[in-house]
From Swiss-Prot:
One of two assembly initiator proteins, it binds directly to the 5'-end of the 23S rRNA, where it nucleates assembly of the 50S subunit. Keywords: Ribonucleoprotein, Ribosomal protein, RNA-binding, rRNA-binding. One of its GO terms (biological process) is translation. SUPFAM superfamilies: Translation proteins SH3-like domain. InterPro entries: KOW (IPR005824), Rib_uL2_dom2 (IPR014722), Ribosomal_uL24 (IPR003256), Ribosomal_uL24_CS (IPR005825), Ribosomal_uL24_KOW (IPR041988), Translation_prot_SH3-like_sf (IPR008991). CDD domains: KOW_RPL26. Part of the 50S ribosomal subunit. Belongs to the universal ribosomal protein uL24 family. This is Large ribosomal subunit protein uL24. It comes from Pseudomonas fluorescens (strain Pf0-1).
């Protein structure tokens, strides 16, 4: 079970976007996350009339390493760590500071 999943709200704790918050769009296999509106890079694309792609400079989200982000706890308005707890035979994610469920 992953500590950070898609649609989690995270806060960046290291790097050029430190302190910014965003929502996880995609979790990649190599422990990296794509976060909406953060870690933007410019990519130069060639026009491709066959697929309808217009050329130019496109800004898109690049992946961040999971160690540079922390899950955002809306109750405390701070970055938090994630732990696991077994309730009713199911393993759930909980915030370390409040011991409340992340997905609640």
């Amino acid at each position: 079970m992953q500590k950070i999943r898609r649609d989690d709200e995270i806060i960046v704790i290291a790097g050029k976007d430190k302190g910014k918050r965003g929502k996880v769009l995609k979790v990649l296999a190599d422990n990296r996350l794509v976060v909406g509106g953060l870690n933007l890079v410019k990519r130069h694309t060639k026009p491709n009339p066959m697929s309808g792609v217009q050329g130019g400079i496109v800004e898109k989200e690049a992946p961040l390493h999971a160690s540079n982000v922390a899950i955002f706890n809306g109750e405390t308005n701070k970055a938090d760590r994630v732990g696991f707890k077994v309730e009713d035979g199911k393993k759930i994610r909980v915030f370390k500071s409040t011991q409340k469920a992340v997905d609640a």
